[in-house]
Amino acid sequence: WEATKKSPISTSDLAWRVERVRLPLAATLQRDTLEKTLADTTANDRDRLNASTKLALLNRTDAGHQFELTRLRLGSVNVLHMPGELFVEYQLAAQQMKPDATVCMAAYGDYAPGYIGTEIAYTQGGYEVQASSSNTAPAVEKVLMDAMRRLLTD
């Protein structure tokens, strides 16, 4: 704490910005299959819970829900608030978008999307981008990167 560099800030150093986006959902989110799983009283509780959360995401999306991405600026420090569990590439890209400032990222703002991979990660496979872990489509990377760029532009 004692080694922390402290800087005074004024109201002109503070900013709050919001970008709303629709996240492209995974093709594996099939309403009829999820509804059957949820209605199946012989299915295990974990599968039924998973189906219910995925159905809730589908319902929110169908109703026009947009996810809020936000930026808090405190002087030269920027904090992005993001949905889901993001791959580290999003943090690295955010820092490159604003190389002369500190950029921090706080994810898990809304966990409905689950893991959010990069476009290429969905073709490479792995736990984080499989149907049980991620509810987003590969196109999500462009949506989020574009929104991050808009947020970080002064």
Protein language model regions, located:
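Non-catalytic substrate/cofactor recognition surfaces at enzyme active-site rims
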Residues: 1-154
